[in-house]
Amino acid sequence: IKALIIIKIGGVLVNSTDNIIISSIKGLAATGLNSNYTLLLNTLNSILQQIFNGITASVGNVNAVETNEKKKKMFKIINFLNFWLFAWCTIAFIILANSIVSICFGTRYILGQNIVIISAINFYVVGMQNAVWTYKTTMGLFDYGKYLVVGTGVINIILSIILGQKWGLFGILLATFISRIVTNVWYDPYAVLKYGFKDNPMEYFGTYIKYLIVGVMTFTITRICASIITGNMLVMFIWKLIICILIPNILFIIIFCRQEEFIYLKEKSKGIVNKLKKKS
């Protein structure tokens, strides 16, 4: 219970202080502009979290009865699914966010592309921790890194003030990214692999970097394709949306079609579709 309380306090320091610092340094107007983008990201995150919330119970069952090798296999599958969904949403957000805000609220409410990108990076970094946090929770590894979460919050506040005064809203969001990267983004996977699976964590970090490279490459290709689109705002948005749906997923299928995790998820998806067909 003590570890959970400390983790909650750290979470508040990381997640709930940015708006206070933004309004203090840049004013309420900047907070309001940023809130439109935060709303989009929170909506995406809520949808994706429904998927991973359903997985947590299954992971708990696997951890209770299966071998360590089976646990690691399921971890890799969930981590792969995690990457696919969050990388796809991150790419789509960067390309579509300003168009959505322009259509819904007007062009005067859009933020610079650098702020959109750093917001999306924070979304991706947190999202990529889902598999790790799921296993950390179901394995009961709360004690590992409990004080580091508070450290993340303290670093975030200090850097947000320093970088916020220098670069404004971008600096505050960059501070959040840095505070996570230097603490729990590397330590939580380390704890799960070393103390949960009794395994070398370097394989995870190698996979993380591989997925990151694929994500950046996919984003670059998708963005080039989207930049070709011309026309009025609504028509451009529709075409960009189609591009964001098709190109990342097609590229992921081409790149990962032979990977064990993809094959497993494909077979599972086929099984679900067949069950739905029988019911209908």
Which residue ranges define each predicted feature?
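Interhelical loop/hinge segments that connect adjacent transmembrane helices in multipass membrane
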Residues: 1-15, 20, 58-73, 191-209, ...
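Interfacial/gating helices of multi-pass transporter permease domains
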Residues: 4, 21-42, 108-114
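Transmembrane helix-bundle signature of multi-pass secondary active exporters and lipid flippases
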Residues: 7, 11, 15, 34-53, ...
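Alpha-helical transmembrane segments of multi-pass membrane transport and lipid-handling proteins
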Residues: 48, 72-127, 157-161, 165, ...
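Membrane-interface junctions at transmembrane-helix termini in multi-pass inner-membrane proteins
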Residues: 120-152
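Membrane-proximal transmembrane or re-entrant/amphipathic helices at the cytosolic face
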Residues: 199-200, 223-280
